[in-house]
Amino acid sequence: MQRLIFHVDVNSAFLSWEAARRAAAGEADLRLIPSAIGGDRDKRTGIILAKSIPAKAFGVTTGEPVGMALRKCPQLVLAPPDFRLYSKNSNAFIAVCRRYAPVVEQVSIDECFLDMTGTGLLYPDPVAIAHIIKDTIFSELGFTVNVGIAPNKLLAKMASDFEKPDKVHTLFAHEIPQKLWPLPVGSLFSVGRSTAEKLTAARIRTIGDLAQADLAYIQRLTGVKLGKLIHDYSNGIDDAPVLSEPEAVKGYGNSVTLEQDVTTLAQANQILLALCDSVASRMRADSRRCACVTVTIRGNDFRNRSHQRRLPEPTDVTAELYAMSRTLFSELWDGVTPLRLLGVTLNDLCGDDAVQLSLFRDEKKERARKLDQTVDQLRGKFGVTAISRGSVTDASRRVGRKYKAELDPGQK
């Protein structure tokens, strides 16, 4: 039986979700004006997390500092990130997908794969049911998605990127020569900038050129493992299964997928800080501490890699969790591979009253815990954007707050 995989991707998720909320309240639709999510307009700090199509026309790009974006587009409407809203909408669109698909794999806050294999009796026309899913999400939730239809995850994801927004695209095996092969080789997943430059220098300019090239030659150019992977991808070969989500881990997790890859340690550290800040705050709100930290990264090959480590003792202190996350990240990342996703998970939990008291008071930890409590109280009273936590170390403080971004709840 041929597999049938859908990839459902929210169009400019953060901006679309904020726009839908404002449109429901009778305000201007952010999707139709120069607008963006992220940062502080008055302080001109933070980064652009998402942008509208009109903002893109002014040259505004995801990941750039707010100050730079405002110089390009002085009339840019900025909305602060609201991760409770994002989590709510993410759960809602996944719930719609579950009505139609027997197996759903959520791969980030704004995208999922549906394994529709064997549903032909229920849904004889895959394109028709994809339109129903897409239109149901819009009519019930107020935002648009793209749906890619293909025999595997790679082609489904490529298809969902063809033309946006609010579109359904197919990419079956017989369509590969017409739809996939003419695309620039750099648009193929797992082909990063440096790999694309090597291939282009060797006159391999399109995905079709790569597909028809000799595998051994590609491996000499790019390495044995990567060469085999991208050669397979260029020919539409991918056997990765759609994985139903396992039983929920008893922990707290945050993850984020960025439109622009993370390529520097400074960017990664600031995102890790934001993740730890957000997830630790939620853990403290439940009067819990964790004894284990896990850091997850994902490159352009769709594969997650994780490291975890136990702490000397359970903690709820953001600075300690951030320090451990940085250590784990340094063990995971080679410093070269562009990263699309970063995640932090806290588990092996206990109540904050179950921690063994020490005979010797750690004043540094107590100061850090009081700082965390103060930040939590201010945010609880004035909102999550009321106070922005600076870098934990002097080294990362030099980068400043411009890469600061709290990110989506991934578990609790």
Please report, for each region that a protein language model flagged, where it lies by residue.
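C-terminal hydrophobic structural anchor segments
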Residues: T315-D316, E320-G380
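Short, hydrophobic beta-strand segments
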Residues: F113-G118, S306-R309, Q356-R361
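A glycine-rich phosphate-binding loop feature that marks nucleotide/adenosyl-phosphate handling sites
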Residues: P151-L154, D232-N235, R289-N300, L339-C350, ...
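Short, charged/polar surface micro-motifs in flexible loops or helix N-caps
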Residues: N11-A13, R41-R44, N300-R303, L349-D352
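DNA-contacting surface of Y-family translesion DNA polymerases
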Residues: S187, T195-L339
